[in-house]
From Swiss-Prot:
The protein's assembly and partners: Part of the neuronal tubulin polyglutamylase complex which contains TPGS1, TPGS2, TTLL1, LRRC49 and NICN1.
Keywords from the named record: Microtubule, Nucleus
Compartments, record wording: Nucleus
Protein name: Nicolin-1
Organism the protein comes from: Mus musculus
Gene: Nicn1
C-alpha cells in the first residue's frame, strides 16, 4: 500500500524535571514533544518514523477530531514502547524506528496533532530525544488493471484445440504416416540382397528385363 509524507511542525521539547535541578542529582527524565500539522486536514496516520537518540521508552498521545459538533480529544495510542531493552546500555540507543497504525491502541483516523512523551530513567546519559521525525498518511489506492479476456479466462487443457479451416485432421495424418512407415519397413526387410544377374540376349541387353526396386 502506498504512503505519503505529511508536512509537520515539530515544536521545541519541554522537559519535566526529576529531582532538584539546583543539585547534581536533578536532571530531566521526561521530555514532551508536540507535533502539529498546519494547513493539513485531519488525516489517517499510516506510519511514524524516527531515529532514536538514547530514549528508553516512548508514549504517544493523539488529538483526534471526533465529530463536527464536539471538541477534539486527546487519546493515548502508544504506552511505554521500549526503545532500549536496557536503559543503562547502548543497545537500541541510536536505532531507526518505524511504528505502524496496527501497533497503536486506537484508530489513527482524523488526526490533528501528536504528542510524544520520551522517558529515560538512566542517569548515565546527559541528553535524549528523537531525531529525523517523519509522519506518513495512507496514499491513494492504485487503480485496478484490466486484463485481456484470454488472460482472465484461460482455456482449459481438457478442451480440444480449435481446428483450422482447410487443414486435415492432425490425428488422421499421424496415423497415415505411421502406416506408411510400417509398410516401408516391411518392404525393406523382405528385399533380397542377391545381386541381379546380367541378362544377355543375342549379345545385347534387353532393357525390358531391367528390374527397378
Amino acid at each position: 500500500m502506498s504512503r505519503v509524507l505529511v508536512p509537520c511542525h515539530v515544536k521545541s521539547t519541554v522537559a519535566l524535571q526529576v529531582g532538584d535541578m539546583r543539585t547534581s542529582q536533578g536532571r530531566p527524565g521526561v521530555l514532551v514533544v508536540d507535533v502539529t500539522f498546519p494547513n493539513i486536514a485531519p488525516f489517517e496516520l499510516q506510519e511514524i518514523m524516527f531515529k532514536n537518540y538514547y530514549t528508553a521508552f516512548l508514549s504517544i498521545r493523539v488529538r483526534q477530531q471526533s465529530s463536527m459538533h464536539t471538541a477534539a480529544k486527546w487519546v493515548t495510542c502508544l504506552r511505554d514502547y521500549c526503545l532500549m531493552p536496557d536503559p543503562h546500555s547502548e543497545e537500541g540507543a541510536q536505532d531507526y524506528v518505524s511504528l505502524f497504525k496496527h501497533q497503536m491502541l486506537c484508530d489513527m483516523n482524523r488526526v490533528l496533532e501528536l504528542r510524544l512523551i520520551l522517558r529515560q530513567p538512566s542517569p548515565l546519559w546527559l541528553s535524549f530525544t528523537v531525531e529525523e521525525l517523519q509522519i506518513y498518511q495512507q496514499g491513494p489506492k492504485s487503480p485496478s488493471l484490466a486484463f485481456p479476456k484470454w488472460l482472465s479466462h484461460p482455456v482449459s487443457n481438457e478442451q480440444p484445440a480449435p481446428r483450422l479451416e482447410g487443414l486435415p485432421d492432425p490425428s488422421r495424418v499421424s496415423s497415415e504416416v505411421q502406416q506408411m512407415w510400417a509398410l516401408t519397413e516391411m518392404i525393406r526387410a523382405s528385399h533380397t540382397s542377391t545381386r541381379i544377374g546380367r541378362f544377355d540376349v543375342d549379345g545385347c541387353y534387353d532393357l525390358n528385363l531391367l528390374s527397378y526396386t
